[in-house]
């Protein structure tokens, strides 16, 4: 089966989550992704949050499928020589080291261009070079705090909250992926590679654009009519936290369903659409609200929006969350059950679509991983297990022209 990136070689100098999520997707699209790891150590996530002693952690295996792994010590002369040969043959190099780390290895962008002017250099950092935080170490929640997500997440009477979704890490990887694919297309026109940089702060901010929209509206109006604070609460000079309210102008809230007293996920998310208000009233047994001037428009409803949700909840609390969604869907009401990770892991439809995939690694055995979220008509990514540390070192070196004796000597010299 032909794949979009067949014939593209990627050098993966990334670790933890932001970089590996990007290079894993490149591998799913058919690129030959070579993960370069420290001899005897490897990516730190191989050892983090283990569920089986001395076996690669799920943290690693779920972010590095379809890749090849080599152990390479770039501090040695032989290791640097191998690195230069790899760069010469590669199409893309991706790194997410601390600022300046790859330069200290001797591989500045200028030197890389000399070795291979067609190479595309992808780089993930916490902050842009012009940021005052450029030297701050960045992880997932650091990026959420600096990118505007934390200040706008949570309830108005509580502290900022970070999302459980990887807005700082995997989201940054997906943004870089888009940039790398664009750079590949640009190379087809120019014949030259380029540097593509992605800051975690920028990636989070790009998902918070509606909050920047709201900031400008707040500056002009002094209030935000779709937020729960309107019209009875107060607004400060910055976009407030809105709890579980919808952020796109359509009021929404988390509602209890049957069993909520003991099941922490017995809830649905319910959205009120202006154009679907009549159906909403019929669904919840309040047809009189259709023509009542206190309820007939979104502006009229906002002062007592929580009373409306409480009325809707009187119905949803009597039935199972799946029954609630099935019933409300008949009225074209946007809603969904709050699915636990346990439910997601067992969902047959997600298995069927390839969104959740079972793979097998030689030492770990079978495990679940998240599959490719995009569904293509011309090809289906074949999700394979993550590599063992150094599993492909000899094979990659042989492809570069090294003999068995030379490979043995490099191992003796701790270059691999």
Curated annotation (Swiss-Prot):
Keywords associated with the record: Transferase
UniProt xrefs under InterPro entries: CoA-transferase_III_domain (IPR050483), CoA-Trfase_fam_III (IPR003673), CoA-Trfase_III_dom3_sf (IPR044855), CoA-Trfase_III_dom_1_sf (IPR023606), Formyl_CoA_transfer (IPR017659)
Single GO molecular function: formyl-CoA transferase activity
Reaction equations catalysed: formyl-CoA + oxalate = oxalyl-CoA + formate
GO process annotations (BP): oxalate catabolic process
Coiled coil: none
HAMAP family referenced in this protein's UniProt entry, alphabetically: Formyl_CoA_transfer
Protein name as annotated: Formyl-CoA:oxalate CoA-transferase
Origin species: Shigella sonnei (strain Ss046)
